[in-house]
């Protein structure tokens, strides 16, 4: 393992796909343009294109070939192929739990034993393809400038916990996890009663205060610029705010919610199926993110 390999693994775990035939393995990584324009109205795709030079310099020496790039309005894809029997391909498959799509991948336990710098590189790879920084005034109702990094994970419950635990391993607390679960995404059963029974089946969002995410950072230029700007603003506007707290170090807020008819849905992991949750830490703890 090295920092370059860790970064590549993070990109694959975050938004990668692996296709394999009898002789060759093809890996595609999708870098979405979450918003078409940055906060200062610059074209996101231009920033991603500029950042690809840095990403190429990290990955191409590792894989020993040029990355193939393609672009649509909403994302940039990078692709490479190598023979199945090459060591780097066998290692990638092993370390992503043999999943072929990011929605089915899981971090191999070995990844939690790599160096701190390698863990940060892995998280940076994940953040570059799934994360974005958001200027937010909803973390606290009475205060603004509570800016956070959002890492979005569609469908993969166990990857949410893997990412939270990897952040914990480098001493970065999660501020909140917005699970794609009926008790959180349709907490008052309003959408269900409107006939939108599966409205709650949304991506999971891991949220981290911007200043706490600085040790990870982004290789995508516009994301890094926003991270630095919003981190400075958060600290300046809230000098006494204690962002460095894990959920088990502060009181857990539970909100009484009605039972939701979809709490037994087959799409939910077996460990939480049939259970009712009134706080995200209760769910996260049951799946393995805790003290």
What are these regions (language model features)?
Residues 1-291:
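Internal intein/HINT superfamily modules and their associated LAGLIDADG
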